[in-house]
Curated annotation (Swiss-Prot):
Function summary: Involved in the biosynthesis of the tetracycline antibiotic, oxytetracycline.
This protein's name: 6-methylpretetramide 4-monooxygenase
EC nos: 1.14.13.232, 1.14.13.233
Molecular function via GO: FAD binding; oxidoreductase activity, acting on paired donors, with incorporation or reduction of molecular oxygen, NAD(P)H as one donor, and incorporation of one atom of oxygen
Cross-referenced Gene3D superfamilies: 3.30.70.2450, 3.40.30.120, FAD/NAD(P)-binding domain
Lineage: Bacteria, Bacillati, Actinomycetota, Actinomycetes, Kitasatosporales
C-alpha cells in the first residue's frame, strides 16, 4: 500500500541521541517524522559522557548548545598518574582551534537526551516508547515495515526509514549489512563518588600497576566515571567493584581513596567494528547501527550525532523537492571514511589508555618527564590530542560535494568546517553575522559583490539556499551581512568580489571569484540542488504549499 498522504515522511527507529538529533533536524526543516523505540521509556543510566567541540558547534546551529553547556562540566586537561606521582598534565584547552567551545563537555547521555526530547516536544514531536521495529524491507519508492507493541503487530508503509537502533540494529540486520572488525579487551565502567582530591577540570589516567583506571568527572559534585581497563572477570557486583577501584586508585595515586558503591556498572567488550554501506534503497543506518568504537576517546555518541546531522539536511532537501536523490549517495561517501579513520585512531587511544605492557611502569616516567621538559614537543603532542579529540580536524575534502582543494590558498579550505574562536566572533562584526546566519537550516551562499544576480538566484534557489550579500557597512533594514573590517572575507579566504558556498552542516563546499550568475547556477546544480522551476512541487515533496507561508523561491531571513 502507498504511504499515507499526511503520514510520516521518515520513520526513525531509535530514540537515543542519534535518532533524536535526526528527528530534530528533519522537523526543523519541516519534514514529518515518526520516532519509535523498543524500550519502555527513556534511559536512566549515564552511558556516553563527553560532548566534543565539533558536536557542540553542530548543536549551536541546532539551537541546543547553550542548554547543553549550562548543564555540563567543561574539561580542559588530561592528567597522568603513577605510584603517587603526577607524571604530566596535558593542556587540552581548544582555545587555539577554530571553535566557540574550547573544551570537551562532560554531560551524561541521560541529560543530553532530555534536552533533545524537550526541544522535539516543543516542535510537536513525541516518542512512541515500547514500539519495536520487527521487520523492514525497501520496496522501490517506499519502505514496508512491521511494528510491534504489546504483542500486537502494525504494518506501515513510509517513504523513508532510518535505523538509529544501536549496535544490535534490526534495520542493519534486515538489510543484510554486516559489522566488520574485532572485539578485544574487556573493560568495566562504573559511576562512583570519589573522595580523591583530584582536579575536576581534567580527565585523569591512573596507572594502577596491573592496568589503568580512567577517571572522567560528571557535572555532579564528587561523581566520576571510572573506566577500569584491567578488569579480568573479578566480579561486577557493586561492593566488589567498589573495593577493587579503591585498591587500584590507592596504588596509582599513592594515597587512600574513598569510593562509594557504584550507581551503575557495565562490563563490556571493547569493539572496533563498522559496516561498508550505510544505505539500501530508502533505508539508512546511523550511529552504533553503523559503527561501534572503543570508549577510550569518547567519540561514539559524537560520531553518531554527526552521522544524523549529516544525513538530516540531505534527506530533508530530497524529501522537500529541493535536491535530486543523488545527494543521498554522499551520506555514505562522507561518513564511511570518517568511521574508518575513527576506528584507526580509537585503536591507538585504546592501547594508550590501557597500557597493557610490562615495561610501561618503567618507561612512562622517563618518556613523560622528557616530554614535559621539552615544551615545543609537549605542545605538538597536545595539539595532536586536541585535533583528534575535538572532532574539528574532521573534513570532507574528498567528498563529491567539495569543489577545489584550497592548496596554498588562505582561509578555510573547501571541505573543512567554517568556525571561529569565541574571541574572533566577539571582535569582528562579520564573523558574528556569519555565526548567526549558520543557524538557518539552508545552504548559505555569500556574495562579496552583487552584480544584480542575487535576486535572480533567490527566486530560483531561495527555498534551499540562503543568499546573502556581504557589504562593508551595516544594513539595518536589509538582509546583507556587514563585514566592516573585512574579517569575514579574509577568514574564508575569498578573493575580493568573490563568493563562498557553505553547506547546511557548516562545511565549506566551494569558493571562488565571481564570474556571473551562470557560474553559480552551474555550481548549485552540480551539488544536486534543483531550481524552483524544475523542483517536483512548490512546497514539500507532496506538492503542498510551503508550510512557512513564504512565496516560492523568496529568501526569508
Amino acid at each position: 500500500m502507498p504511504p499515507e498522504a499526511d503520514g510520516p515522511q521518515v520513520l526513525i527507529a531509535g530514540a537515543g541521541p542519534v535518532g533524536l538529533t535526526l528527528a530534530h533536524e528533519l522537523t526543523r526543516r519541516r519534514v514529518r517524522v515518526r520516532v519509535i523505540d523498543r524500550a519502555d521509556g527513556p534511559a536512566t543510566t549515564s552511558r556516553a559522557l563527553a560532548v566534543h567541540p565539533r558536536t557542540l558547534e553542530a548543536c549551536h546551529q541546532m539551537g541546543l548548545a547553550d542548554a547543553l553547556v549550562a548543564r555540563g562540566r567543561p574539561v580542559v586537561h588530561f592528567t597522568v598518574h603513577l605510584r603517587g606521582r603526577q607524571l604530566i598534565r596535558f593542556d587540552t584547552n581548544y582555545g587555539r582551534l577554530p571553535t566557540a567551545y574550547p573544551f570537551s563537555l562532560m554531560l551524561d547521555q541521560v541529560r543530553t537526551e532530555e534536552i533533545l526530547r524537550e526541544r522535539l516536544a516543543g516542535l510537536g514531536v513525541g516518542i512512541e516508547w515500547g514500539v519495536e521495529l520487527a521487520d523492514c524491507a525497501p520496496c522501490g519508492d517506499r519502505v514496508n515495515a512491521e511494528l510491534r507493541r504489546d504483542g500486537r503487530s502494525e504494518q506501515v508503509t513510509v517513504p523513508w526509514l532510518v535505523g538509529a537502533d544501536g549496535s544490535r540494529s534490526t534495520v542493519r540486520e534486515r538489510l543484510g549489512l554486516r559489522l566488520v572488525g574485532d572485539a578485544t579487551q574487556t573493560w568495566l565502567n562504573a559511576d562512583v563518588v570519589l573522595d580523591a582530591d583530584l582536579s575536576r577540570d581534567s580527565n585523569h589516567l591512573v596507572h594502577t600497576g596491573s592496568g589503568t583506571v580512567l577517571l572522567v568527572p560528571f557535572p555532579d559534585p564528587g561523581k566520576w566515571r571510572a573506566v577500569d581497563t584491567g578488569y579480568a572477570g573479578q566480579g561486577a557486583d557493586p561492593e566488589t567493584v567498589r573495593r577493587r577501584l579503591a585498591g587500584s586508585l590507592a596504588r596509582g595515586l599513592g594515597r587512600p581513596v574513598a569510593v562509594s558503591e557504584p550507581t551503575w556498572v557495565s562490563v563490556f567488550r571493547v569493539q572496533q567494528r563498522m559496516i561498508t554501506a550505510m544505505r539500501s534503497g530508502r533505508c539508512f543506518v546511523a550511529g552504533d547501527a553503523a559503527h561501534v568504537h572503543s570508549p577510550a576517546s569518547g567519540q561514539g555518541m559524537n560520531t553518531g550525532m554527526q552521522d544524523a546531522y549529516n544525513l538530516a539536511w540531505k534527506l530533508a532537501d530530497v524529501v522537500r523537492g529541493h535536491a535530486r536523490e543523488e545527494l543521498l549517495d554522499t551520506y555514505a561517501a562522507e561518513r564511511i571514511p570518517v568511521g574508518g579513520r575513527l576506528l584507526s585512531s580509537t585503536r591507538t587511544a585504546t592501547a594508550l589508555v590501557a597500557l597493557r605492557n610490562a615495561v610501561a611502569p618503567v618507561a612512562m616516567p622517563v618518556g613523560l618527564s622528557f616530554l614535559k621538559a621539552v615544551r615545543p614537543l609537549k605542545r605538538r603532542v597536545e595539539h595532536r590530542i586536541m585535533a583528534g579529540m575535538s572532532g574539528l580536524a574532521l573534513h570532507y575534502a574528498d567528498s563529491p560535494l567539495t569543489y577545489g582543494t584550497g592548496d596554498g590558498a588562505a582561509g578555510v579550505h573547501p571541505g573543512h568546517l567554517v568556525a571561529c574562536t569565541e574571541q574572533d566572533v566577539a571582535r569582528h562584526p562579520g564573523l558574528r553575522a556569519l555565526r548567526q546566519a549558520l543557524t538557518d537550516p539552508r545552504w548559505l551562499l555569500l556574495l562579496f559583490a552583487d552584480d544584480g544576480g542575487a535576486a535572480e538566484l533567490a527566486l530560483r534557489y531561495g527555498r534551499a539556499v540562503q543568499i546573502r550579500t556581504v557589504i562593508p557597512h551595516e544594513d539595518e533594514d536589509g538582509p546583507a551581512l556587514a563585514d566592516p573590517d573585512d574579517a569575514l572575507r579574509q577568514t574564508l579566504g575569498v578573493p575580493p568580489g568573490g563568493w563562498a558556498l557553505i553547506r547546511p552542516d557548516g562545511y565549506l563546499a566551494a569558493k571562488g571569484q565571481r564570474s556571473g550568475t551562470t557560474t553559480l547556477t552551474a555550481r548549485l546544480q552540480a551539488l544536486h540542488l534543483l531550481p524552483e522551476d524544475t523542483a517536483p512541487g512548490a512546497g514539500d515533496s507532496a506538492g503542498r504549499p510551503a508550510p512557512d507561508g513564504t512565496r516560492r523561491g523568496v529568501t526569508t531571513e
